[in-house]
């Protein structure tokens, strides 16, 4: 352990101001983080009157030397950093040297510690802002104990913001839960008013971490927990997706993000999670999760917020796409069946059946299936870009994977990798093919196209009126709802897949086509849309690419067995290697 030093004025000026102690849970958080930084294996926490009377945190870490006790409770004194460059590579919870000084300023605090190099423990006592301290020897095992009494005794205005003891206790309990879920190898014992409230036993094996999860949140059914474990170069993502045991909105959501074992509030990670789930179930906030992201410490900036609960990623786009694709990939491995990018069913492999942490229970599948079958819940459960599903025949029994999207190239193409082969895929053509398959699948399965209102007035002749009259039922089947008068017709709705087209031009062309054909059939309309619909998108990003590839996996995975030349082109790596070798 490095000795505690006073930070230079130039270094302390570069550090974001530390957290103001606002409530007992703030004290608990700071003291627990200090114990973890001291490599403690056992931590005892005790509170009286929800921490307002007394807070005690005792650990068996490496302790503090006698001559450093006064420094330990001084402002801007720390063993974690000593130069400006250290701020770019922080591997500890604390680094500002302000925690104990801030706690000392608003309480009567006693610090007792025995270092690994000493046979005698020493204590130091301080009250509020007073510079008077009392140092004396005392019996204590190796480690540190901090007793915080009469919190805010000298700042009574702070007490006015304390709602009640119960709410403060719940905040303390939440703080301890967050620490327990990121430090599996530590025994944590929590006492409330001298009675053991909860204990979290240390987890020594990685595959037993889920038991800590169950201890922390005992309402969780492990049959509804899906484990996430992905890696990309020096970045790893581990954690759990937690589904409610019933699809009830009353299930308490748990949304915890950890970066390098530090609990953080990070909208980037949450956005990646929500958007990946939106691809599956059509609801961004319908699941709970606990995720642990690990990456080199020099890739993040912790020194931006007093609580250190907010961080900044230096390469945020990479982090976003890694988390986004990792969750989709994990769902694939458990054979998630994509249904129009909005909901999922699941079939279990033998591995899934034998490992609760890797899979969802079949009960969840049956509940989802049951909800899917209820007509009155279609709109809530399945909302597609194109159709309202009303036929179970739409569910397919295969799940196909054709490779991994690496990067987006020149805004329109994606670099794919599969089975030692690199290929370029055209996103615009892929999107058009998917729309064609959707349309054919809908008509084949008697699906009702989803529509949207669009006012279109078209003047017609007597002959054209007769043609439309003969084709009204077929047009309605495709979502064209029109009011036919003697000399004109008024179009009220059109199918939603036409929404992004140049409608005035397209509709005029469409009805001219009908007047020319006179009698039209389903295949005529499908063929016309196949050749006429344009995919008007100026550029594609990585997320767009993932979305269209997911649609291909569901609607038309067989297209990659013999792909059109303009859809997919393999890159001849051997030719390139020959050139490079020369």
UniProtKB/Swiss-Prot annotation:
Keyword DNA repair tagged: yes
DNA repair recorded as keyword: yes
Gene Ontology MF, one: ATP hydrolysis activity
Keywords: DNA damage, DNA repair
One Pfam family it belongs to: DNA_mis_repair
GO CC, alphabetical: mismatch repair complex
Gene Ontology BP term (one): mismatch repair
Cited function: This protein is involved in the repair of mismatches in DNA. It is required for dam-dependent methyl-directed DNA mismatch repair. May act as a 'molecular matchmaker', a protein that promotes the formation of a stable complex between two or more DNA-binding proteins in an ATP-dependent manner without itself being part of a final effector complex.
Family listed: Belongs to the DNA mismatch repair MutL/HexB family.
Name recorded for this polypeptide: DNA mismatch repair protein MutL
């Amino acid at each position: 352990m490095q000795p505690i030093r006073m930070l230079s004025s130039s270094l302390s000026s570069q550090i974001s101001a530390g957290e103001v102690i606002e409530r007992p849970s703030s004290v608990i958080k700071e003291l627990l983080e200090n114990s973890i930084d001291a490599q403690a294996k056992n931590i005892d926490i005790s509170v009286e009157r929800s921490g307002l009377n007394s807070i005690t945190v005792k650990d068996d870490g490496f302790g503090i030397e006698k001559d450093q006790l006064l420094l330990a409770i001084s402002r801007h004194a720390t063993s974690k950093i000593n130069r400006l460059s250290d701020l770019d590579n922080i591997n500890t919870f604390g680094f500002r040297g302000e925690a104990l000084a801030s706690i000392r300023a608003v309480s009567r605090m006693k610090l007792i510690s025995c270092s690994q190099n000493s046979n005698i423990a020493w204590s130091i006592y301080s009250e509020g802002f007073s510079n008077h301290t009392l140092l004396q020897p005392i019996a204590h095992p190796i480690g540190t104990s901090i007793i915080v009494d009469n919190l805010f005794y000298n700042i009574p205005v702070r007490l006015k913001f304390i709602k009640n003891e119960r709410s403060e206790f719940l905040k303390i309990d939440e703080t301890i839960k967050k620490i327990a879920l990121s430090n599996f190898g530590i025994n944590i014992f929590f006492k409330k008013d001298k009675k053991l409230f909860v204990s979290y036993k240390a987890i020594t094996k990685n595959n037993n971490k889920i038991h800590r999860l169950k201890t922390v949140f005992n309402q969780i059914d492990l049959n509804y927990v899906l484990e996430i474990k992905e890696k990309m170069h020096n970045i790893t993502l581990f954690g759990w997706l937690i589904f409610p045991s019933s699809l009830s909105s009353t299930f308490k959501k748990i949304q915890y993000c950890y970066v390098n074992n530090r609990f953080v509030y990070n909208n980037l990670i949450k956005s990646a999670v929500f958007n990946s789930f939106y691809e599956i179930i059509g609801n961004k906030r319908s699941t709970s999760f606990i995720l642990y992201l690990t990456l080199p410490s020099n890739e993040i900036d912790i020194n931006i917020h007093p609580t250190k609960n907010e961080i900044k990623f230096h390469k945020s786009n990479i982090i976003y796409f890694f988390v986004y694709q990792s969750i989709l990939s994990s769902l694939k491995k458990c054979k998630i069946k994509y249904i129009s990018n909005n909901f999922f069913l699941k079939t279990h492999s033998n591995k899934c059946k034998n490992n609760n942490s890797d899979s969802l229970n079949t009960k969840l599948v049956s509940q989802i299936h049951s909800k899917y079958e209820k007509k009155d819940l279609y709109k809530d459960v399945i909302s597609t870009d194109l159709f309202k599903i009303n036929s179970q025949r739409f569910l397919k029994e295969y799940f196909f994977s054709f490779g991994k999207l690496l990067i987006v190239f020149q805004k329109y193409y994606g670099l794919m990798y599969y089975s030692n082969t690199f290929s370029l895929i055209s996103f615009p053509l892929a999107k058009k093919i998917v729309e064609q398959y959707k349309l054919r699948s809908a008509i084949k399965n008697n699906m009702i196209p989803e529509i949207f209102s669009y006012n279109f007035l078209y003047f017609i002749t007597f002959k054209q009126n007769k043609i439309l009259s003969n084709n009204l039922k077929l047009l309605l089947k495709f979502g064209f709802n029109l009011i036919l008068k003697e000399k004109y017709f008024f179009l009220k709705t059109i199918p939603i897949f036409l929404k992004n087209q140049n409608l005035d031009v397209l509709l005029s062309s469409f009805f001219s086509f009908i007047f020319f054909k006179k009698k039209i059939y389903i295949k005529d309309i499908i063929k016309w849309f196949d050749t006429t619909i344009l995919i008007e998108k100026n550029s594609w990003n990585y997320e767009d690419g993932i979305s269209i590839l997911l649609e291909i996996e569901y609607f038309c995975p067989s297209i990659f067995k013999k792909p059109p030349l303009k859809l997919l082109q393999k890159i001849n790596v051997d030719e390139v290697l020959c050139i490079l070798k020369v």
